[in-house]
Amino acid sequence: MDKVMAQLEGLVAHYEELQEMMADPEVINDTKRYMEISKEEADMREVVQKYRKYKSDIKEIDDNKEIISTESDNDLVEMAKEENSELEKEVAELEDEIKILMLPKDPNDDKDIIMEIRGAAGGDEASLFAGDLLRMYEKYAETQGWKVSLIDSEPTEVGGYKRVAVMITGDKVYSKLKYENGAHRVQRVPVTESQGRVHTSTATVAVMPEYEQVDIDLDPKDIRVDVYRSSGAGGQHINKTSSAVRMTHLPTGIVVAMQDQRSQQQNREKAMQILKSRVYDYYESQNRDQYDAKRKESVGTGDRSERIRTYNYPQNRVTDHRIGLTLNKLDRIMNGELDEIINALVLYYQTQQLEKMAEENA
């Protein structure tokens, strides 16, 4: 904890500098700079407040120890001992909270995401399960106050999806859904199964942060653009002009379709923004050395082929294989109640990071 405390002293000094800057008329008049400083100050506020409380409690404990060792009044001594008993519990809790707050932040945690779900092994049943997963995430997004927008889809005749991509926007979306990367396995009796046998199918989920400003230039020659009429439910055309846009990045095969915006130009701009995000994420993922090391320290590799979770319908059971968590409430989880799983994954990640921090400070 000593190394962490040394870091905290520097952090508090920087926090106080930020507060002084926020009172500077020159900064106040520069809206962009003021907003940047204000956000940095807000991000640091909780850990600074807890550290100040921690230091205050330590001082109070020391003062009480002085009373205990020198005071002749037994009542005062007992009072000091009782106070220290409570303060020491509070200090231990504050230490744990401060350690978690001092963990390295994932720079993408505040970002919106692009989620792609694909029916994998299992044919029609896999495509149906891909649709079930999409609805699960849509319901979870609703509980979080997030917005889900369709980017592109490839529906199947049975009512599922061979592939569907959505954008999910809101507060800290990536921080919660980044753990969904991987292969999701389902065990259930398909609606087409006459013998009542349980089949196993899989769908893969890929979660990518959406980058508002991506430092990547795409060669126009590498992009094929198709325009077509927007279509609504059941495939009926809802727009007489060709306002929908599909962009294909030929070197990677990444496809983005956009029809949510009001005009073809707006659809082009949004499609290009999403395409840049996805191509950027694709090339970032090619450099796997550092990427894999980071992901393995947290929860698995995040590879789409890695089986992360099994949904067993006959037994109403969901198992997350990365952390060995089993919950007998599949019906509620498929209805969007994902918090218990996500919170357990976050805790697992934090515990691993804390263990690493302890080794470094040993």
Curated annotation (Swiss-Prot):
Primary location group: cytoplasm
Lineage, highest ranks first: Bacteria, Bacillati, Bacillota, Bacilli, Lactobacillales
Function summary: Peptide chain release factor 1 directs the termination of translation in response to the peptide chain termination codons UAG and UAA.
Xref: SUPFAM superfamilies: Release factor (SSF75620)
Keyword Protein biosynthesis: yes
Signal sequence, start to end: none
Keywords: Cytoplasm, Methylation, Protein biosynthesis
Location of N5-methylglutamine modifications: Q236
An MF annotation (GO) of this entry: translation release factor activity, codon specific
Name assigned to this protein: Peptide chain release factor 1
Pfam families cross-referenced by the UniProt entry: PCRF (PF03462), RF-1 (PF00472)
Compartments, as annotated in UniProt: Cytoplasm
UniProt similarity note: Belongs to the prokaryotic/mitochondrial release factor family.
Post-translational modification: Methylated by PrmC. Methylation increases the termination efficiency of RF1.
Underlying gene: prfA
Gene Ontology CC annotations of this record: cytoplasm
